[in-house]
Amino acid sequence: RQRQMCIRDSRTRDLGSEYAISDSAGYLDLVAEHRLVPGIHRVSYSVANRKPVSANLYTIPASAKVGIISDVDDTIMITQAPVPWKAAYNLLFLDPKKKASVPGMSVLFTRIADLFPGAPFFYLSTSPWNVESSIRNFITDHGFPEGPLLLRDLDPRPKTFVPTGPQHKLEFAEQLMADFPDMKFILVGDDGQKDPTTYATIARRYPGRVLAIVIRELSPRESTGLASVTGLTSTQPTPVTDVPVFTGTTGSNILKTMLPYLKTVLR
């Protein structure tokens, strides 16, 4: 259904009206060109006969040459994604204040942000848009750098409710590569799903565009859940690629080995 959307920033400056067509669930992609200074803008969106809603708009500086693409589930937030029923409960029903952060990951991300001022952080998850506010609050509450969330439409079918998401992540990563052709990326994920393979695929498809791959290793307690049900391992091997790969169970462990490399990148 086509809607006219009015956009205003927090300074009540009218950014104009745009037309967009939403899908049956009301989701839409809107491409609009406006002159804004880099940073985070509080923007309100409104359509006829509806109350306006507000959201953050992230404007990325043209000078930013490094970006971070990070998984959410079991990379920065403990959800136990390898075990579908636990992941569904943790994502949809667990009180946001009780969601646990992966130890040291916010410190790692903050250090990366300090090393690369203005670097955008893109948070990629197979979680549905319905839990956007919960993930957003988690990022803020646990001290992670703010950034756009790239989620998916809700599909309640059992096989796709909590998907592994390789195709979802590939599509968004490829879109970011196209949107920011002069930017190189640090890819951050975990070994509980298909992130190692997915990120290795991205590195092969875009030679010279991936600075590093970071894989957070699940703890034995996290990784044994699926094995106890299926008899199969729930973790994936370290990716085979020419790109530097850094692994560890916590952000602090990863930072110790990754920091010297990042400093060489800055030279």
Residue positions per predicted region:
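C-terminal cap/substrate-recognition subdomain and adjoining C-terminal extension
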Residues: 127-267
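Edge beta-strands of extracellular beta-sandwich domains
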Residues: 51-60
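Short, small-residue-biased leader/transition segments that mark boundaries at the very start
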Residues: 2-7
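Glycine-centered loop-to-beta-strand initiation motif
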Residues: 16-34
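Asp-based phosphoryl-transfer active-site loop
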Residues: 67-81
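Short, aromatic- and glycine-rich surface loops/edge beta-strands on solvent-exposed regions
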Residues: 37-49
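Short, acidic loop-to-helix structural element flanking the phosphoryl-transfer center
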Residues: 93-119, 129-133
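Short amphipathic beta-strand segments in non-cytosolic proteins
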Residues: 8-17
